[in-house]
Structures are given as C-alpha cells and as structure tokens.
Regions:
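N-terminal short secondary-structure element
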Residues: 1-31, 36
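A short LG(V/I)-centered, amphipathic sequence patch enriched
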Residues: 41-61
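Alpha-helical linker/hinge and terminal dimerization helices associated
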Residues: 43-44, 66-88
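Short beta-strand-centered segments that line the small-molecule binding cleft or hinge
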Residues: 87, 110-114, 132-168, 172, ...
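Central regulatory/effector-binding core of bacterial HTH transcription factors
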Residues: 92-154, 223-224
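Beta-alpha-beta core module
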Residues: 155-161, 165-166, 228-277
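Flexible hinge/capping segments at coil-to-helix
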Residues: 157-194
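Secondary-structure junction motif
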Residues: 178, 193-214, 279-290, 295-307
Length: 308
C-alpha cells in the first residue's frame, strides 16, 4: 500500500465516483487510477467500491470504513508535506481557503489584502461553495481552512473555532409597504413574498426556526446561493430580502431600504474549520488570526491537536 493509492481512493469518492474526473483532479490518466485502486483492493483483500461493469457506483460497507481511514491518511500525508515546506520556505507556498460567497465577497477582502501584504509570495486560492462542500474540501485535504456559518461542526473530521457573531437585515425597495413598519415582526414579514438564502447557506436555519416559533410559514418566493442575487431580485420586486447584515453596502445599495432584523432572529456564528491533527503552516495561522483577531495561535493548536 502507498499514499498514491490512498489519494486515488479519496479522489474517486470526492469526484462522485467518476474515475475520469478523479484522474483529471490528480493530473493522471484514468487507467492509472483504476489500476492503483484494484491493486489496493487486492492487497487488502476487500472490495472498496461497488461496481457495475467498469463503472464505480458507490462504496461497499467495508469501503465506507476504508474511505474514512483513507481520508485521515491522505490528510496526514498533506501535513507531512506542509511541515517540510514550512521548514524550508516559511514565507512561500499556497494557502487554499474554502468559503461561501458572503464571506468571500463581503468579509475576506480586508483579510486578503492584509495577508498579501505580509506574504507576497504565498498564493491564495479561494474555493467557493456551500458550507457542506467547504467542510468536505478541508476534510479531504483539498483546502486548508474552511470559513462558513452552517455545517462545519457536523463533520467528524474537523474541529471548529468561533470567529464572530452576526445577524440579519431585511431589504426592500424604498417605497415598499414593509418600510412603513415601525418595528419589524415575523407576522409582518409573513405577509410578503420573501427572497433569502438556500437552506444550505448563511444561517438559513435560524430564519426557518424563527418563523416556526412564531407560528408562521414563510412565503419564500425565491432562494439564492449568494447575497448579490438576493439584492438583484429584490430590485426586480420579486419579494423582500432577508440578508446577512454584512452584505448590505450603504453606498452601492442606497436604492434599497435596510431594516434591522436582529430582534427577530437568533444570531449566527461564523466559524473556521480545520482538519483534526493537521499541521498548518505558519502563514495559515496568521491568516486565521487576521480573520479573527480574538483567536491566538496557541488556542488554535490546542483545539486542532486535542482532537485525537
């Protein structure tokens, strides 16, 4: 058994059991991936993948357990490489951040600017997806750090640290009837079509919970994957928007009325997610601290390496 075989097993699962896509992701040929996986299965004496002809259809029961171990091994191999690089080129390398649109668009620009000034020779990569994808990318060693609100804490291969709390605002065209409400209520919001985030994104669960607690069902006319889309369709009068507060920009969004909704919804917490026991390069710790100044490197290390 070797790390290459382990890497290919992870790549096949992470690419929807498409061997050809896994080969592209690993910069190799499809027959190479298939051969390495078959060799590994023969060495272990167990079948990792369910097959239909030459196609991989999913994991066997044993394969589920093998994949969990393979993810850990693949992560450890990544940590070894990071350790070697940190010893030889502490201020050069690649840092991959997995995050959502709201974080990438409205929160991270300040951090990226600060980081790039300190580490001009580190290449930053932003992988944008939903929180579940962000967690999977870090768990599978495709990203170093995940930044999101939902889902990160649910992945057993990750540890998370709280960074900051935030809430929501309601946005509407300037002459919309909702703007005449002196104090917003769930009852008032329930009268109108709503535009908000998809269920997998940006604290949507808190919104659903607030409506349910008040005994109302939200009339969700449209769900979106990012804040800019919500604002676009509010401008088209499709509905009123429930938006992450940091996504409202007073100058650019002056044509929309912003109404505070923090009294209606429980606050959400944005977290960083890291792979358990992962070796992080020094510049990765610096990025986290720039993003969340309340965190200290020693605190981060304690959480990462306590999870054994």
């Amino acid at each position: 058994m070797n790390f290459q075989q382990v890497k290919f097993v992870c790549a096949v699962v992470e690419n929807g059991f498409s061997v050809s896509d896994a080969a592209v992701a690993c910069y190799t040929a499809q027959p190479v991936v298939s051969k390495h996986i078959k060799t590994l299965e023969d060495e272990l004496g167990l079948q990792i993948f369910e097959r239909r002809g030459k196609r991989f259809m999913g994991l066997t029961a044993a394969g589920e357990q093998a994949y969990a171990i393979a993810k850990r091994l693949n992560g450890d191999a990544t940590s070894l490489k990071a350790l070697a690089l940190d010893m030889t080129n502490a201020k050069e390398g690649v840092l991959t951040i997995a995050t959502t649109h709201t974080q990438a668009r409205y929160v991270l620009p300040r951090v990226v600017t600060q980081f790039s000034t300190k580490y001009p020779d580190v290449k930053l990569k932003l992988k944008q997806g939903n929180p579940k994808q962000c967690a999977d990318w870090v768990a599978g060693s495709e990203a170093d750090i995940a930044i999101a609100t939902e889902a990160l804490a649910l992945d057993p291969l990750l540890v998370t640290l709280p960074c900051y709390r935030w809430n929501r605002c309601v946005i509407a065209p300037l002459k919309h009837l909702i703007t005449k409400e002196k104090v917003l209520s769930i009852e008032a919001l329930a009268k109108y079509p709503l535009i908000t985030y998809d269920t997998a994104f940006t604290g949507r669960s808190q919104v659903d919970r607030a409506f349910a607690s008040a005994g109302f069902t939200p009339n969700v006319a449209l769900t979106a994957l990012d804040s800019d889309v919500i604002k676009t369709y509010v401008r088209l009068n499709v509905g009123i928007g429930i938006l992450a507060e940091m996504a409202y920009e007073p100058k650019l969004d002056a044509d929309l009325k912003r109404m505070d909704a923090s009294h209606l919804f429980a606050a959400s917490v944005t977290r960083v997610g890291l792979r358990k026991n992962a070796f992080l390069r020094r510049f990765a710790y610096d990025f986290i601290v720039m993003f969340a100044p309340s965190l200290k490197r020693t605190e981060i290390e304690e959480v990462v390496f306590a999870a054994r």
